[in-house]
């Protein structure tokens, strides 16, 4: 079984030293969902929400969040991201929004947390913008879809998940 990398021999939390690692292209994709009533989703899709373009605001919030992950999650490294993409999809059949984020860099550590943070904050932004019309929206699940690059190798969620 793998060891927890952020715990030292004394059981204390610490930031991993990546100075000896090789720089490689690293990429991660994550997704999040926001479930809501059909009329709330319709308001977002039609652009009739009184606060403005919900998807555009959530996209920008997700991008900003990815760039600031190191300030939010204590043991994350500050990273020079080369790409952050946040896409939002209205799933009217299931009355939800699906958010997919992609983060990429050439560096010594992965971007999984940045991708997860981007998707999560985009979902939180949708909630914030729509809570005046619906307070019982549900956020989740949030998960890593794929990662590539680095010593630990590639990961991808099974297609049937």
Swiss-Prot record:
<keyword id="KW-0501">Molybdenum cofactor biosynthesis</keyword>
<comment type="subunit">
    <text>Homohexamer; trimer of dimers.</text>
</comment>
<dbReference type="InterPro" id="IPR036522">
    <property type="entry name" value="MoaC_sf"/>
</dbReference>
<dbReference type="InterPro" id="IPR050105">
    <property type="entry name" value="MoCo_biosynth_MoaA/MoaC"/>
</dbReference>
<dbReference type="InterPro" id="IPR047594">
    <property type="entry name" value="MoaC_bact/euk"/>
</dbReference>
<dbReference type="InterPro" id="IPR023045">
    <property type="entry name" value="MoaC"/>
</dbReference>
<feature type="binding site">
    <location>
        <begin position="75"/>
        <end position="77"/>
    </location>
    <ligand>
        <name>substrate</name>
    </ligand>
</feature>
<dbReference type="Pfam" id="PF01967">
    <property type="entry name" value="MoaC"/>
</dbReference>
<protein>
    <recommendedName>
        <fullName>Cyclic pyranopterin monophosphate synthase</fullName>
        <ecNumber>4.6.1.17</ecNumber>
    </recommendedName>
</protein>
<dbReference type="GO" id="GO:0061799">
    <property type="term" value="F:cyclic pyranopterin monophosphate synthase activity"/>
</dbReference>
<comment type="pathway">
    <text>Cofactor biosynthesis; molybdopterin biosynthesis.</text>
</comment>
<comment type="similarity">
    <text>Belongs to the MoaC family.</text>
</comment>
<keyword id="KW-0456">Lyase</keyword>
<feature type="binding site">
    <location>
        <begin position="113"/>
        <end position="114"/>
    </location>
    <ligand>
        <name>substrate</name>
    </ligand>
</feature>
<comment type="function">
    <text>Catalyzes the conversion of (8S)-3',8-cyclo-7,8-dihydroguanosine 5'-triphosphate to cyclic pyranopterin monophosphate (cPMP).</text>
</comment>
<feature type="active site">
    <location>
        <position position="128"/>
    </location>
</feature>
<dbReference type="GO" id="GO:0006777">
    <property type="term" value="P:Mo-molybdopterin cofactor biosynthetic process"/>
</dbReference>
<dbReference type="InterPro" id="IPR002820">
    <property type="entry name" value="Mopterin_CF_biosynth-C_dom"/>
</dbReference>
């Amino acid at each position: 079984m793998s060891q927890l990398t952020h715990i030292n021999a004394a059981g204390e939390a610490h930031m991993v030293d990546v100075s000896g690692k090789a720089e490689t292209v690293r990429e991660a994709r994550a997704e999040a969902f926001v479930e809501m009533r059909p009329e709330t989703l319709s308001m977002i899709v039609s652009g009739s929400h009184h606060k403005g373009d919900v998807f555009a605001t959530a996209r920008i919030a997700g991008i900003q969040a990815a760039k600031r992950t190191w300030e939010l999650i204590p043991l994350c490294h500050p990273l020079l991201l080369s790409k952050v993409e946040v896409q939002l999809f209205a799933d009217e059949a299931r009355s939800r929004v699906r958010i997919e984020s992609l983060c990429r860099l050439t560096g010594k550590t992965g971007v999984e947390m940045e991708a997860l943070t981007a998707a999560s904050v985009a979902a939180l932004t949708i909630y914030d913008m729509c809570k005046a019309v619906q307070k019982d929206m549900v956020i989740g699940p949030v998960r890593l879809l794929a990662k590539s690059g680095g010593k630990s190798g590639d990961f991808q969620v099974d297609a049937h998940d």
